């Protein structure tokens, strides 16, 4: 039975059972303590290797084969098929966003234009019939795979249109190019729109995006729940900003930079305004591992694979999972959840009650007592299986193993855990401390923490009224009314209704500037940032909604609408909205330059002239369209231009069924100087 309140999905060593286990200046800044266990390892747990795998042709490892054959994980009659799949390239897989009108249209177009087509091409001197098939275990028919690796797809001229479609729609957040097995863990977590979710080791972010999508499953309404996407590596955190914040277009996510095994206690206000320790409703824990399941795409592993890599990471895995369990709601002991009835078409193997412990030479040790003294630092007690009675009580068979030869995927290990009682062990810091909201809870250990990386600019919320922010706002907006200036004039300029005053908006400006982006976050993200910014390094949060720009004297408000956050702003607007036909929208998007107003229809020309210069939203609800298109635009004195980047322009052309123009736009043949000019202005 799936827990409806507290789940944590945990991926441990792939194939191997293990115990749960901008100021632009680089300098040391206060925040978390670095975990030296990971200094030499990347996300996968493997040391960084040069990208020369295209020269690796021998996909064979005697050490790997000895280990897995000794374990008996793979039935003898399946062994050759298992090795054959491991030695072949991994198919490219992707999924469409659920509960999105544009995603529904894109999915239908994909099925009509590409799914039924059969294409022949040559890959490594072999004639290949390219097939696209639906991944039958993924819900609602939203996931697909192509029987070509990513590099081969990119190089085939016969498949250029399909490749362009995938790249453009990925950049716009309509689909996610994601390994099939990576899609599985979030599907077992039963995400609801009010849940607080922690992704402890989030980079590169594909599963984080999945979690965010599930948070938005109820439709267009802004969820009250949120996702904290954390990663140890500072550089990978900025990849997360692009993957999780930009592509998901969600105001319900924040990126943090912290060692997952030392993720600090964080605090949120309760209904009485008192700060209490946050216990997350769901936690995804994709721990560093030996990457056995990635052999099909990480070819260097064939040379580098070693059982000691898994042993070296075991303690770290356990520390991360234990910390995650402490952060999970209603603290206590855990049990493995039986998810055998979920995703019935997903072929999986059950977890094992017993496994063998080998050293680097292939010697098997039945118990810790048999391990030589010189190996006990590497082969420790925690690596050995429990007694059979304990294994039965723990229901280890409820773990899931995904093997490559079952459904032509990578490999994965998954365990879904649920809290059911109190822990018999403690980290020594488990009290739910209650203090008045806003009071600093910084402990001596937190004060002494230091973190490598870039010093982040502060988060400044526009609807706060403390003295420090008032002084800052008076300088920034050159108005005695401070942040009230923004809300008053923007509300009046765009005709915002009363709900706009409740928006949680922030800036990341350390110094006064004529440029600046305003981000939208939901209320709980605001509380998280305000009450925990001194406890954990926060990289970024929120959805770009407004941007300050240089304007002429005739424009009363020097803020423009940003495409990313337009869907949350338009329902509040009653002014500066322009209805536009499909043909005129196509004309605007395909234009290399801004369009002169005199070249538009008389009706549209009249509407735009009446609105006047400045930012506006163009809305196209064509009769035969299955969704409404909303485009942030800039109206000049005599011209109009949509404020879209190349990918968004190509995306709208796809949606408006002008595929050739979309391909030309993406390749660069359809872009012009208007984007560069507008970017220079703002």
Segments (PLM) and residue ranges:
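Class I S-adenosyl-L-methionine
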Residues: 85-86, 92-195, 214
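Short glycine-dipeptide loop
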Residues: 194, 218, 224, 328-332
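Conserved class I S-adenosyl-L-methionine
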Residues: 194-203
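Mobile active-site "lid"/loop adjacent to the S-adenosyl-L-methionine
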Residues: 234-235, 275-334, 377-378, 382, ...
